[in-house]
Design a protein with these regions (language model features):
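HotDog/MaoC-like acyl-thioester-processing domains
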Residues: 3-4, 67-69, 79-115
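Generic secondary-structure boundary/loop-capping signal
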Residues: 19, 58-60, 99
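Hydrophobic beta-strand-centered segment that forms part of the acyl-chain substrate-binding groove
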Residues: 41-79, 85, 103-106
């Protein structure tokens, strides 16, 4: 059986860091960034829940630099690896204007066994 991945309606989204999302130093809280990355990964996985286990079997998050108040950020997804048993999804967050990376996250999912 071939695994056909349904791509989400969008492969990226943008947001502006606002006052409620930053610390006293005006840096974006890492928990806010993590939630945005995680929810975007879920948007990719949910349409594929009939063929993929929805809980990631592996996860890695790499913070590269801080984001600050009023910065425009772009979150993108990309399939990094796909075979008959496993899918690795890469989520990247970068500054919109300079394309400087803020963080990268990889989520590894297994395909459900055919019944």
């Amino acid at each position: 059986m071939e695994n056909k991945i349904l791509k989400p309606a969008q492969d990226s989204f943008e947001f502006v860091v606002n006052k409620r999302q930053v610390s006293k130093e005006k840096t974006l809280h890492s928990s806010i960034l993590f939630k945005k990355v995680q929810s975007f990964a879920n948007e990719f996985i949910i349409p594929n829940k009939n063929i993929l286990d929805t809980s990631p079997k592996s996860f890695e998050l790499n913070f590269i630099q801080n984001a600050y108040l009023n910065e425009e950020l772009v979150v993108k997804n990309q399939i990094k690896k796909l075979n008959s048993t496993y899918l690795i999804l890469l989520i990247t967050v970068s500054k919109k204007t300079q394309k400087d990376p803020i963080c990268e996250a990889t989520f590894g999912y297994t395909f459900k066994k055919a019944s």
